[in-house]
Amino acid sequence: MKKLSNYLDNKKVILAILLIVSILTLLICSKNSPLYPYNDWVDGNAFFTMGKGMFNGKVPYKDLFEQKGPLLYLIYGIGYLISHDTFLGVYLLEVISYTIFGYFLFKIARTYLNQFYALLVSVLTLAIISGSISFVQGGSAEEFCLPFVASSVYFFIKIINENDFGKKYLLINGAIAGCVSLIKFNLLGLWFIWMALYFFKLISLKEIKKAFISCVYFLVGMFIPIFISILYFVINGALRDYYDVYITFNLTAYSTTIDLKTRILNMFSAI
């Protein structure tokens, strides 16, 4: 066991194992996988069309309609550049995303467990998530947000344990929140909680000035990717379309009243 533990101390070995696990699980569970003759998931095809359009002179929301965020379309667009006629490129990006997710899961688990059990937890988590009902057919907005979620949880643990102001962590996590807002902005709840917990921690330590400065660093980091997206749509004369579709449409089109019991049942049925 000691030899195995020493072997698992190597970062490259951990990444290689997680990469192999990601390749195999997604090969089976994602319809972007080359094992599937075609991908019949409507959303995935819509994302691919949007991404393809971006790299062929079309502007999202102006020339093509779909209501997810522009960063998701960019990801699918890069997948299109890898393979014009199949979802192979998207599958490869899924593998990279899933490997990064797994690595941060490992780092979180490693805070409390030894190398072997931390890796085991990470591998099992990857397998369970990819095999769950909520995974759908693979390539969802939520799936591509998983590395952002895991990295932010890890950074939060690190910043709390080190009891450090951590300006770089605030900027990084602000930027991560900005990226998530450009994929699916209603997933931002975690980052509001992240920042609120850190803010009130500093307040409890009577670090009032640092508490407010930390919010500024976080918001600056968050603004950077959002500003880049705004600049893109301004240059392409589509800022109003961007706002009308991605913000207004998403805030109004799916408004429905669901009681608490139904929400809880829906949550467990997705597992």
Question: What is the predicted role of each segment?
Answer:
Residues M1-N6, L190-F223:
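Perimembrane helix-loop-helix junctions
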Residues M1-S30, R110, G166-L170, I213-V220:
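Start-transfer (signal-anchor) and selected internal transmembrane alpha helices
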Residues P34-M50, Y61-I78, H84-L88, G237-L239, ...:
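Extracytoplasmic catalytic/substrate-binding loops of multi-pass membrane glycan-assembly enzymes
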Residues L105-I128, L146-P147, N163-K168:
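Transmembrane-helix signature of polytopic, membrane-embedded enzymes
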Residues F116, S152-I172, L205:
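Membrane-interface transmembrane helices that cradle and orient dolichyl/undecaprenyl
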Residues K168-F185, W191-A196, V220, I224:
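Membrane-interface alpha helices of multi-pass inner-membrane proteins
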Residues S214-A253:
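Membrane-lumen/periplasm interface segments of specific transmembrane helices
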